């Protein structure tokens, strides 16, 4: 059954979000459920700017009472502004964990994601890696199964920064994204396991590589390299 795209375009200027959402929706085979979900999207979605997007990230993390679950790019900051955003997220992770809030992040499985993964992990988040995330098209965070904050890049590409986003205060949408998140989470590689895998591979190619060299190459603290090498008995 064809979806009424013109109606969606008229409501909240959500055209950029539709392709990705359709991938999620089409995974749910119930035709009636898809129709209901699309109606809910058009009724509740609100487009937000880049600054509003990160303001909403901050607000959501500050007010979350039970859980924060996100699939994000995890790409390294390119300038001071982006680094400040990462620092503020680290701070909110620490605050959330002190309140007993569960914080889980999925990142694309790639060595160049280890720096941000390490920073979030050190702040108290549980981090895993998956090789087939859709963060090149969309990145999202679900707060307390109440609403979803979806970020869109300036152009397709897993390293492109978030340009704008959509705030969807909908438990129904939150459940859809959580289902997708939980499926990937169950398949994903834990932070320590992936870091150990990368270090083991590096050591196999360069057995004499120093901790300092590995730290520099992976852009993570030397202490973290030592910890994983010791716990995993690598080298």
Residue ranges and their predicted role:
Residues 103-134, 152:
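DNA-contacting interfaces and partner/effector-binding or oligomerization modules
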Residues 215:
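The alpha-helix within a helix-turn-helix
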Residues 224-232:
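Residues in the recognition helix of alpha-helical DNA-binding motifs
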Residues 1-14:
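Feature marks short, highly hydrophobic, charge-poor N-terminal signal-anchor/signal peptide-like helices
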Residues 128-176, 181:
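HKD (HxKxxxxD) catalytic microenvironment of the phospholipase D
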Residues 194-209, 226-227:
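Short amphipathic alpha-helical interface segments
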Residues 74-82, 110-113, 172-174:
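Short acidic, S/G/P-rich loop/turn micro-motifs used as interaction or catalytic elements
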């Amino acid at each position: 059954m064809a979806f009424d795209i013109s109606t969606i375009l008229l409501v909240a200027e959500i055209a950029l979000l539709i392709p990705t959402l359709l991938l999620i929706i089409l995974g749910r085979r119930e035709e009636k459920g898809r129709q209901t979900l699309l109606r809910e999207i058009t009724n509740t979605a609100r487009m937000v700017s880049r600054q509003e997007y990160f303001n909403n990230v901050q607000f959501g993390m500050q007010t979350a009472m039970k859980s924060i679950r996100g699939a994000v790019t995890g790409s390294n900051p390119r300038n001071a502004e982006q680094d400040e955003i990462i620092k503020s997220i680290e701070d909110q992770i620490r605050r959330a964990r002190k309140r007993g809030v569960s914080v889980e992040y999925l990142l694309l499985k790639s060595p160049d994601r280890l720096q941000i993964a390490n920073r979030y992990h050190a702040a108290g988040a549980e981090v895993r890696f998956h090789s087939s995330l859709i963060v090149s098209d969309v990145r999202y965070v679900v707060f307390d199964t109440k609403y979803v904050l979806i970020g869109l890049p300036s152009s397709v590409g897993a390293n492109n920064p978030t340009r704008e986003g959509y705030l969807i205060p909908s438990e129904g949408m939150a459940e859809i994204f959580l289902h997708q998140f939980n499926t990937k989470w169950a398949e994903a590689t834990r932070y320590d396991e992936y870091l150990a895998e990368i270090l083991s591979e590096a050591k196999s190619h360069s057995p004499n590589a120093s901790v300092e060299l590995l730290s520099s190459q992976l852009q993570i603290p030397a202490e973290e390299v030592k910890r994983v090498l010791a716990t995993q008995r690598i080298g």
